[in-house]
Each structure stands twice: as structure tokens, then as C-alpha cells.
């Protein structure tokens, strides 16, 4: 299953989660960064 990877090359540690028709990449290292990014 290939999904448009437009959210900056997703790293292997990042997991793509589909929520409310929205692509959310939950990263263990980018977890804090994701919250800061609006």
C-alpha cells in the first residue's frame, strides 16, 4: 500500500496513522516536534 508521501520523507521509525481522514505520522523521536508543529 503506497500512500502519497508528501509529509517529508517518513522515516522507518515513523508510523503512519490514519485518523479522521487525516494522515498523522507518529514518530518516537518526532513526537515532540509534531506537537510543536501546527
UniProtKB/Swiss-Prot annotation:
Keywords: Apicoplast, Plastid, Ribonucleoprotein, Ribosomal protein
UniProt entry tagged with the keyword Zinc-finger: no
GO molecular function: structural constituent of ribosome
UniProt cross-references to SUPFAM superfamilies, sorted A to Z: Ribosomal protein L36
Predominant location: plastid
A Pfam family hit: Ribosomal_L36
InterPro entries: Ribosomal_bL36, Ribosomal_bL36_sp
GO biological process: translation
Family per record: Belongs to the bacterial ribosomal protein bL36 family.
Designated name of the protein: Large ribosomal subunit protein bL36c
